[in-house]
Amino acid sequence: MSADITETPNKQLLEQIRSPSFSLFNCIYELKNHTDSIGIQHELVKKLYSFPYEDLQFFIPQFVQLLVTYDSESMALEEFIITYSSRYPHFSLIVFWNLQAYIFELKNEPESRSFQAVRNLITKIQNIMFNADQQTVKAPEFRENFLPALVLCGAVASSVLLPSFKSYCLPMIKAQGKQQKSLVFKLVNFQKSLTKNLTLKNQRMSADIPKGSHSDDETATSSSIKPSLSRSASVPRRNTKKTSLSFSSDESEAYTTDDDDNKTSIELEKDFYKIDLDGLSKEKSANFLEPEENLNVNTAIKSKKRLSTLTSKVMTQPWNGIDGYNVNSQSLPDLSKAEGRDLIPFISSTESETSLLYHNNSISNDLQKNIPRQQKFSPGFDNVYLTKLLQVNYAKNETQFIMALQNISIRLSQVPKEARLSALRAELSIINDTLLPSEIDIPQLLPITSNRNKKYHKILKLNVNEASVLNSAERVPFLLFIEYLSDEIDFNPTTEYNQRIIARKKMNGATSMTVKKINSFSEVADGNFEKENKIKSSTPETVSNIIYNENTEEADLSEMPLDRKTTVSSDSFSPEMLVTPSITEQSKLSNFPSLNTKEVSTKVLADQMRIAAVMLQQLDSSGKANSEQSFLIKNRIVESMIALQDQFDSFDFEKLSQLQSDEPSAGERKLENDFKLGEDWNTKKQRIKKSSAYGHLKNWDLCSVIAKNGDDLPQEAFACQLISMISNIWKKNNIPVWTKRMKILITSANTGLVETITNAMSIHSIKKSFTEHSIKSGENSKGKIFTLLDYFHSVFGSPNSTSFRTAQQNFAKSLAAYSIICYVLQIKDRHNGNIMVDGDGHIIHIDFGFLLSNSPGSVGFEAAPFKLTVEYVELLGGVDSEIYSQFVYLCKQCFKSLRDNSEEIIEIVELMQKDSTLPCFNNGENTSVLLKQRLQLQLNDEDTDQFVENFLIGKSLGSMYTRLYDQFQMITQGIYS
């Protein structure tokens, strides 16, 4: 295997790989081009370990794409991903979420090599993330692979004369030896090509066979996987034959298991966080765990009694007594059986939180009394294991938090618009009560402040009062403000804070203590609840106390909208009940707390809002939502929700309410959203800090994100990645232009978190707000639309002032950069709602739903190379001004720099377009070909300058197509041109 890398044609490549100038991009490029050479693959992956972690994390989507779509016998890249996932928790999370997106994309091809590769890798990643005992579980060093064994024999023989050869080839032999039989994947594709029609027939036959009557494992697998993966991860099940499952949070996780029996023996009763009860083998003794032990975040607790029995069995197992474990057969490890067997860690204060007052410290004191010192760190628990225990705790908390956010948008979409804000506040309050504060941060989005300290941030709470639902025509994105402590947590088991986490987890495992449920959708596993009274400030009169009571635990509430067996399910909540409400129903409506109700806890408010949201949802789905009685009931529920909403801390929505209408246009929605985002960031941050119970902590900080869902999120993330790469090229070549580095964290195929742009407003909102204000004040009787130049005058002063000149130059530098980016990447839909201006005068493009191959309405309406209006040129001082000449010069420099480094952009697009279903790759393999053509690589420098000035700028300046598109958006969507 190593011979192919030392042959004469590859000697030059080997020298390049070992050269210090060999970049990370070069590694990715060569990995794509040498998938058939195991030796070259291993040498390239060996080079990957020499690059900084931040650069490797940036290219995670490309690494996953290489593994999924490029067939290779090499195990090198997979071993690299597994190694880094074990070493860096953020790396494993991002890989995990990217794999979830691929699972959804490949849901209709479960027999394909790509699907099998994704399932195999996601199983290993989940084992790393959720299995604390994995260091005692060793996969077979060698499988039934002839070639690695043969090379190993040769290495042993050659070591007599070449002792160093063994150390050189041993890593490659060990990696290849772990590979499953390559024949398996070949047979899968071979079978698929020969029996395509027969497979479709078998699927239809399997659908007619009753459950449990499968005579053969293959048929059972085919019949269980395919239908299960046919649904979006964010769409609830409404009509399903499995009445025990009414709602699933993410199907891409639920169907990655190899254990077919689990699917038929488990009844799914709760969504979002559920425990697989068949992790223990019924045929094996209680001294070790079943090889198919699963952590399935979407499986349910079937019965409290059964879980209690299972827990008592698990607690008798020695920590290091796992034997015969097959990592490759595992899907999600069972959260109920991992380290301590609790569902969430005890939420205690870190060193930075010691100044907070607690009303009840009895739990902490009891634990300190009852846990012997030697129990915390017994000889069997070395630091490696304890570190892994902390990392697993972090991974659990992180995935639970992200899934909770994912499901909020889904539920908000089922609530009337006028009640969405109330429902959002209720959902966020429940997350605060059940999950936070905890060992959670947001990879990629929360700012990195101290790489040297290797510490992570800790989310304290979601600010309920500042959160808002963003207005959207189709989906329901919402804005979050997250309070966190920077550089707060790590995985060092010797710190006092981490010792408390470990001790409490051991305490829970040793005494089978019941644990309160993780989130608003999980079921309480046992009959007893651990009461934890948390006070969030030393001034309790300013913060609502959180009450934990067995009678008001959300478990009962969450059963209402999710379990079809409950009284509020779609089966029992009939249309007649809605049209003619009973006395009981009327009393429920009348029992909503009024505006004058005092001392109502946050939890009670959240519960009441959840009930109201469920009733509204059932009302709309009853089929009689348009009747007069239903209309009256709906109004009554909405009024109650608004009353409940006002019982949270106050928030000024007076101006916002003036903007709202029954069916707002896109322009009105954009202005409304900009109002929510437009407040000066530092002012908002200081205001929230003063009102926060945690604001006095020295490392307190605030960030804002937008939770979105939609099919174009992976495409937007890819566009942001391309823009970052282009910006890096310009920075490396010292070209003084400016772009905004936007970040999008993909958490599934159609959900994610988007970094917000602070201190900026869309050009549409600027024009609309200034124009309407001038009309109302009598200064603009003719209704003339304000221009950007008018805006710059009002914000930055006179044209001769230093602030105006600085803002003008900032506008020119950013305009040049985004102009070239829009042309090269063919970014379309460039109306003024998708272009922003920040507080320094920079222009910023957002919303990259159309690029490379696709355009709005599949019509090439925007035929100009990029958007360069007469208004932009007017702001630059006209075509004869010095600033305009600077803009033209920067455009030329940017374009020539991209041409000189064109292989980076072209190759990344070529890599990602293979077998992709993203709309931006509608042209297939021609996508990268057309990109290369746009860069005009055949031109010399002089001709390139002429091309930029005469073609790109000349055809864009005042283009008729641009004016027509802006007018079209103005007429149809109300977006100012």
Curated annotation (Swiss-Prot):
Catalytic reaction equation(s): a 1,2-diacyl-sn-glycero-3-phospho-(1D-myo-inositol) + ATP = a 1,2-diacyl-sn-glycero-3-phospho-(1D-myo-inositol 4-phosphate) + ADP + H(+)
Keyword Membrane: no
Any Pfam family matching the protein: PI3_PI4_kinase
EC number of the protein: 2.7.1.67
Comp. bias intervals (Polar residues): 220-233
EC category name: transferase
Main location: nucleus
The protein, known as: Phosphatidylinositol 4-kinase PIK1alpha
Organism: Candida albicans (strain SC5314 / ATCC MYA-2876)
